[in-house]
């Protein structure tokens, strides 16, 4: 069931049939709906990119070692789940990029979207290549540029949730989820984005493993 759910995400996104709270979305004007859709695409792309950035390494390691459950049956369930999570996220991300490209009507805007999406795809390729060939490879040089840029946009530098008490952190998380849900954004994207952002604010980029 989990595998089917992950692999169907791109199809559901194509037809815009995600579960969402659309009360305010329905009441919005055409221009308002355009902006709400734009925000949903951007938030979804960022969240899925960060998820894939870490999960693809876990999936590769799991496949290479043929990770198994360690039970009496000793099935390769962990390997299957990690692989399907990454594959499903990649197809989901691809469809969101296509939707964002189609969202614009001007050629300049479409070219900007293609450029940004190209940078994201290049980063994912570099992560895979560096993991397989090492930091000394050609892709390692490119990856170091991404890492250098990433050090300047670490959410933990602006909001360090470890310094907050659990009550305040919980209220912030719930408030952010409610605000995003009210925009009509798919609930799966909301929970993923808030989870990723919370992990970054708690532990930095190392928290993506969680």
Task: Give a label for each model feature.
Residues 1-139, 207-210:
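Alpha-helical transmembrane segments and membrane-interface helix-loop junctions
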Residues 117-210:
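Alpha-helical transmembrane segments of multi-pass membrane transport proteins
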């Amino acid at each position: 069931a989990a595998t089917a759910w992950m692999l169907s995400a791109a199809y559901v996104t194509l037809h815009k049939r995600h579960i969402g709270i659309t009360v305010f979305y329905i009441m919005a004007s055409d221009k308002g709906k355009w902006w709400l859709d734009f925000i949903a695409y951007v938030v979804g792309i960022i969240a899925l990119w960060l998820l894939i950035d870490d999960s693809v390494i876990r999936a590769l390691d799991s496949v290479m070692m043929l990770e198994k459950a360690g039970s009496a049956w000793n099935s390769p369930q962990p390997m299957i789940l990690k692989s399907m999570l990454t594959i499903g996220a990649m197809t989901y991300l691809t469809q969101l990029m296509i939707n964002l490209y189609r969202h614009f009507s001007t050629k300049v805007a479409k070219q900007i979207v293609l450029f940004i999406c190209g940078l994201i795809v290049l980063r994912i390729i570099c992560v895979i290549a560096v993991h397989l060939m090492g930091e000394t490879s050609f892709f390692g040089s490119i990856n170091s540029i991404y890492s250098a840029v990433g050090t300047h946009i670490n959410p933990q530098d602006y909001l360090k949730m470890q310094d907050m008490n659990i009550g305040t952190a919980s209220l912030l998380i719930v408030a952010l989820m409610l605000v995003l849900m009210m925009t009509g954004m798919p609930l799966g994207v909301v929970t993923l984005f808030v989870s990723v952002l919370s992990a970054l604010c708690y532990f930095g980029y190392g928290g993506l493993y969680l």
